[in-house]
From Swiss-Prot:
Domain of life: Bacteria
Cofactor entry: Mg(2+)
Name the record gives this protein: HPr kinase/phosphorylase
E.C. number(s) listed in UniProt: 2.7.11.-, 2.7.4.-
Region feature (Important for the catalytic mechanism of dephosphorylation): 268-273
Keyword entries, A-Z: ATP-binding, Carbohydrate metabolism, Kinase, Magnesium, Metal-binding, Multifunctional enzyme, Nucleotide-binding, Serine/threonine-protein kinase, Transferase
InterPro entries per record: HPr(Ser)_kin/Pase, Hpr_kin/Pase_C, Hpr_kin/Pase_Hpr_N, P-loop_NTPase, Ser_kin/Pase_Hpr-like_N_sf
UniProt xrefs under Pfam families: Hpr_kinase_C (PF07475), Hpr_kinase_N (PF02603)
Length: 322
């Protein structure tokens, strides 16, 4: 987990929508410790009892238009109180004009003022998601993360079972590699877990007998992705002829990752099985279930109906014979 995000990093990563309006010399010294963005409302009326100074202060059309109705002395007072040492920056949306009193207060407190042409709601959601991803607590999982037809699939299993080789086969079939060997995961929201590669391992794979390969260099930029939501876990296990594997798909297993239960499918591996195609089909079948089509349930319903029909025919035949 990152304890902080540098303001300079946030500006650099969002340079297409953010600009430094004032206080460029103060940017490098500012750090952000919370992901929430704050729109000061009551503070403009003079109420500061619960003012979260440590957040980015976002002023949109509502805040700017209300401030314009205040007297000069009152504007100076409220903006001076808002400009604390803990405040990372002020952000003005919709390219609105910056109040002179805010500009002076920010300059005195060494606080940068940023501006964007985006709407207030949009920029708030973009920056909140950005900060949550970088401030979230991270865990590491041994496995390989790939994206199959837009769905994040985590391959797990014992060392040597063939996770990396299987992922390489999936990349050759047009899917994307996210992370090999070590997957860093974090909880994006209540029901969503995101996985990514550590910076040092990004786009790299280790293949026994070959060594380290650069997937982006060999297969192109379309073969890799920086991160993806983990929607399915596929656990590869060595084939055991004595084991009783699920043949119909009635068993529904899950794996807990970052306090979120992720559906898991166990796939036995042995010579002669095309694991890449099986995994591809497993992912598509999982997506079909999410869309409401469950082949296993349909088979079960058809079988139940067939048994019911035969039972009725047998009953009618017995009654007729009597």
């Amino acid at each position: 987990m990152a304890d902080e995000v540098k303001l300079s990093k946030l500006i650099k990563d969002n340079k297409s929508i953010l600009e430094v309006y004032q206080g460029q010399e103060y940017v490098n010294a500012k750090k952000i410790y919370v992901s929430d963005i704050y729109r000061p409302g009551l503070e403009l009326t003079g109420y500061f009892d619960f003012y979260p100074a440590q957040r980015i202060q976002l002023l949109g059309r509502t805040e700017i238009s209300y401030a314009a109705r205040l007297d000069h002395e009152i504007r100076t007072h409220v903006f001076t109180k808002m400009a604390t040492k803990a405040t990372p920056c002020f952000l003005i949306s919709r390219s609105l004009p910056v109040p002179e009193e805010l500009s002076e207060a920010a300059e005195k407190a060494n606080i940068p003022i940023l501006r964007t042409s985006e709407s207030t709601t949009y920029i708030s959601s973009i920056l909140t998601e950005y900060l949550r991803a970088r401030l979230a607590k991270r865990n590491s999982i041994h496995g390989v993360l790939v994206e199959i037809k837009g769905m994040g699939v985590l391959l797990t299993g014992a060392s040597g079972v063939g996770k990396s080789e299987t992922a390489l086969g999936l990349v050759q079939r047009g899917h994307r590699l996210i992370a090999d060997d070590r997957v860093d995961v974090f909880q994006k929201d209540h029901n969503t877990v995101v996985g990514e590669a550590p910076k040092i391992l990004r786009h790299l794979m280790e293949i026994r007998g070959i060594g380290i390969i650069d997937v982006m260099n060999l297969f192109g930029a379309g073969a890799v992705k920086s991160r993806t939501e983990i929607q399915l876990v596929i656990n590869l296990v060595n084939w055991d002829p004595k084991a009783n594997y699920d043949r119909l798909g009635f068993q529904e297993n899950t794996r807990e990752i970052c306090n979120v239960e992720i559906p898991q499918v166990n796939i036995p591996v042995k010579v002669g099985r095309n694991i890449e195609i099986i995994i591809e089909v497993a992912a598509m079948n999982f997506r079909a279930k999410k869309m409401g089509y469950d082949a296993t349930q349909m088979f079960d319903n058809n079988l139940t109906n067939l048994i019911s029909e035969h039972s009725k025919e047998d009953t009618d035949k017995v009654q007729h014979d009597d």
